[in-house]
Amino acid sequence: SLLFNHKPSKDDIAEIFKLMVAAGGSEPGFINGVSARKRAPWFKGANPCVEILLGNKSFCNLTETDVGKFKGDSAGLRRAIYIASRANYRQTCVNLLDGILQEAWHLNNEFLRLCGVGLTGIVRRPDLGGYEYEELKRTATSGAYSMADELGLPRPKNVTTVKPSGTLSKIM
Protein backbone atom coordinates (compact mmCIF):
# COMPACT_ATOMS: atom_id res chain seq x y z
CA SER A 1 0.00 0.00 0.00
CA LEU A 2 1.02 3.59 -0.61
CA LEU A 3 0.45 6.25 2.04
CA PHE A 4 0.11 9.83 0.81
CA ASN A 5 0.33 12.69 3.29
CA HIS A 6 -0.26 15.19 0.48
CA LYS A 7 -1.96 15.06 -2.90
CA PRO A 8 0.39 13.29 -5.33
CA SER A 9 1.23 14.99 -8.61
CA LYS A 10 0.12 13.58 -11.95
CA ASP A 11 3.76 12.67 -12.60
CA ASP A 12 3.90 10.73 -9.30
CA ILE A 13 0.77 8.79 -10.24
CA ALA A 14 2.07 8.11 -13.76
CA GLU A 15 5.30 6.72 -12.29
CA ILE A 16 3.35 4.49 -9.88
CA PHE A 17 1.28 3.08 -12.75
CA LYS A 18 4.44 2.42 -14.79
CA LEU A 19 5.82 0.45 -11.84
CA MET A 20 2.53 -1.48 -11.57
CA VAL A 21 2.66 -2.45 -15.26
CA ALA A 22 6.34 -3.44 -14.95
CA ALA A 23 5.45 -5.62 -11.96
CA GLY A 24 2.88 -7.54 -13.97
CA GLY A 25 -0.18 -5.51 -13.06
CA SER A 26 -0.11 -5.71 -9.26
CA GLU A 27 -2.17 -2.99 -7.66
CA PRO A 28 -1.24 -1.26 -4.39
CA GLY A 29 -3.75 0.29 -2.05
CA PHE A 30 -3.77 4.09 -1.94
CA ILE A 31 -4.15 5.64 1.51
CA ASN A 32 -5.05 9.29 2.03
CA GLY A 33 -3.16 9.99 5.26
CA VAL A 34 -4.77 13.41 5.79
CA SER A 35 -8.28 11.95 5.61
CA ALA A 36 -7.27 8.96 7.74
CA ARG A 37 -6.01 11.23 10.55
CA LYS A 38 -9.29 13.17 10.47
CA ARG A 39 -11.24 9.93 10.95
CA ALA A 40 -8.78 8.38 13.44
CA PRO A 41 -6.39 10.80 15.19
CA TRP A 42 -4.26 7.83 16.33
CA PHE A 43 -3.63 6.75 12.71
CA LYS A 44 -0.09 5.54 11.95
CA GLY A 45 -0.82 2.84 9.37
CA ALA A 46 -3.33 0.21 8.31
CA ASN A 47 -3.82 -3.52 8.05
CA PRO A 48 -2.85 -5.17 4.73
CA CYS A 49 -6.34 -4.69 3.26
CA VAL A 50 -6.37 -1.05 4.39
CA GLU A 51 -9.93 -1.10 5.71
CA ILE A 52 -8.79 -0.63 9.32
CA LEU A 53 -6.89 2.46 10.44
CA LEU A 54 -4.32 1.47 13.04
CA GLY A 55 -2.12 3.27 15.53
CA ASN A 56 1.48 2.39 16.26
CA LYS A 57 1.63 -1.08 17.82
CA SER A 58 -2.05 -1.82 17.30
CA PHE A 59 -3.71 -4.60 15.33
CA CYS A 60 -6.86 -5.79 13.60
CA ASN A 61 -9.55 -7.24 15.79
CA LEU A 62 -12.22 -8.80 13.59
CA THR A 63 -14.94 -11.40 13.72
CA GLU A 64 -16.76 -12.79 10.67
CA THR A 65 -20.42 -13.27 9.83
CA ASP A 66 -21.59 -15.23 6.78
CA VAL A 67 -24.40 -13.07 5.39
CA GLY A 68 -25.19 -15.75 2.81
CA LYS A 69 -26.64 -17.92 5.57
CA PHE A 70 -29.27 -15.29 6.38
CA LYS A 71 -31.04 -14.81 3.04
CA GLY A 72 -34.62 -13.88 3.87
CA ASP A 73 -33.81 -13.47 7.57
CA SER A 74 -32.87 -9.82 8.14
CA ALA A 75 -33.60 -10.00 11.86
CA GLY A 76 -31.38 -13.08 12.19
CA LEU A 77 -28.56 -11.36 10.31
CA ARG A 78 -28.75 -8.26 12.51
CA ARG A 79 -28.78 -10.47 15.61
CA ALA A 80 -25.71 -12.40 14.37
CA ILE A 81 -23.84 -9.13 13.70
CA TYR A 82 -24.84 -7.81 17.13
CA ILE A 83 -23.62 -10.97 18.92
CA ALA A 84 -20.42 -11.14 16.84
CA SER A 85 -19.68 -7.52 17.71
CA ARG A 86 -20.22 -8.16 21.43
CA ALA A 87 -17.85 -11.14 21.27
CA ASN A 88 -15.44 -8.98 19.31
CA TYR A 89 -15.39 -6.38 22.08
CA ARG A 90 -14.65 -9.12 24.62
CA GLN A 91 -11.51 -9.91 22.61
CA THR A 92 -10.24 -6.43 23.51
CA CYS A 93 -10.31 -7.45 27.18
CA VAL A 94 -7.42 -9.90 26.74
CA ASN A 95 -4.36 -9.10 28.83
CA LEU A 96 -1.49 -8.75 26.37
CA LEU A 97 1.17 -8.43 29.08
CA ASP A 98 2.57 -11.86 28.28
CA GLY A 99 6.28 -11.11 28.56
CA ILE A 100 6.67 -11.28 24.77
CA LEU A 101 4.82 -8.24 23.42
CA GLN A 102 5.90 -4.78 24.46
CA GLU A 103 3.66 -3.07 27.00
CA ALA A 104 2.67 -0.52 24.32
CA TRP A 105 0.63 -3.20 22.49
CA HIS A 106 -1.42 -3.84 25.65
CA LEU A 107 -1.87 -0.14 26.41
CA ASN A 108 -2.96 0.65 22.84
CA ASN A 109 -5.45 -2.22 22.90
CA GLU A 110 -6.91 -0.95 26.17
CA PHE A 111 -7.07 2.61 24.83
CA LEU A 112 -8.44 1.94 21.34
CA ARG A 113 -10.44 -1.29 21.82
CA LEU A 114 -10.85 -1.44 18.03
CA CYS A 115 -13.62 -3.73 16.81
CA GLY A 116 -14.97 -4.86 13.46
CA VAL A 117 -17.24 -7.44 11.91
CA GLY A 118 -16.19 -8.80 8.53
CA LEU A 119 -18.81 -10.04 6.10
CA THR A 120 -18.37 -13.17 4.09
CA GLY A 121 -20.83 -14.64 1.60
CA ILE A 122 -21.73 -11.25 0.13
CA VAL A 123 -21.69 -12.66 -3.40
CA ARG A 124 -24.77 -14.70 -2.41
CA ARG A 125 -26.53 -11.50 -1.23
CA PRO A 126 -26.91 -9.15 -4.21
CA ASP A 127 -30.08 -7.92 -2.52
CA LEU A 128 -28.03 -6.07 0.10
CA GLY A 129 -27.25 -2.46 -0.74
CA GLY A 130 -25.82 0.65 0.85
CA TYR A 131 -28.70 1.17 3.27
CA GLU A 132 -28.52 -2.41 4.53
CA TYR A 133 -24.75 -2.23 5.02
CA GLU A 134 -25.14 1.04 6.94
CA GLU A 135 -27.75 -0.66 9.13
CA LEU A 136 -25.37 -3.57 9.76
CA LYS A 137 -22.63 -1.10 10.72
CA ARG A 138 -25.00 0.58 13.20
CA THR A 139 -25.87 -2.87 14.57
CA ALA A 140 -22.18 -3.76 14.98
CA THR A 141 -21.52 -0.46 16.75
CA SER A 142 -24.51 -1.00 19.03
CA GLY A 143 -23.29 -4.50 19.94
CA ALA A 144 -19.77 -3.34 20.78
CA TYR A 145 -21.04 -0.36 22.78
CA SER A 146 -23.53 -2.49 24.72
CA MET A 147 -20.80 -4.96 25.72
CA ALA A 148 -18.49 -2.14 26.82
CA ASP A 149 -21.29 -0.56 28.86
CA GLU A 150 -22.18 -3.87 30.52
CA LEU A 151 -18.54 -4.44 31.48
CA GLY A 152 -18.11 -0.85 32.65
CA LEU A 153 -15.20 -0.36 30.23
CA PRO A 154 -14.53 2.35 27.63
CA ARG A 155 -16.38 2.12 24.35
CA PRO A 156 -14.26 1.28 21.31
CA LYS A 157 -12.68 4.27 19.59
CA ASN A 158 -13.81 2.75 16.30
CA VAL A 159 -16.05 -0.05 15.12
CA THR A 160 -14.93 -0.59 11.54
CA THR A 161 -17.17 -0.19 8.58
CA VAL A 162 -18.68 -3.58 8.04
CA LYS A 163 -16.54 -4.82 5.18
CA PRO A 164 -16.35 -7.75 2.76
CA SER A 165 -13.56 -10.24 3.28
CA GLY A 166 -12.09 -10.31 -0.21
CA THR A 167 -11.72 -13.66 -1.94
CA LEU A 168 -12.98 -15.41 1.18
CA SER A 169 -16.39 -13.92 0.39
CA LYS A 170 -16.43 -15.73 -2.95
CA ILE A 171 -15.62 -19.20 -1.62
CA MET A 172 -17.67 -19.42 1.59
Label each PLM-derived region with a short phrase.
Residues 1-4, 95-106, 121-164:
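Internal maturation/activation junctions in enzymes
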Residues 1-24:
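Polar, glycine-rich mid-to-C-terminal structural blocks
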Residues 10-11, 74-81, 133-138:
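Generic detection of long, well-ordered alpha-helical segments
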Residues 13, 23, 55-58, 115-118, ...:
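Active-site-proximal structural scaffolding
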Residues 16, 83, 130-132:
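A broad, low-specificity signal for short, low-complexity segments enriched in glycine/proline
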Residues 20, 157-172:
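Active-site and channel-lining beta-strand-loop segments
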Residues 20-126:
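Function-dense linear segments that define catalytic or interfacial modules
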Residues 63-68, 154, 163, 169:
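Generic, ordered loop/turn and secondary-structure boundary motif
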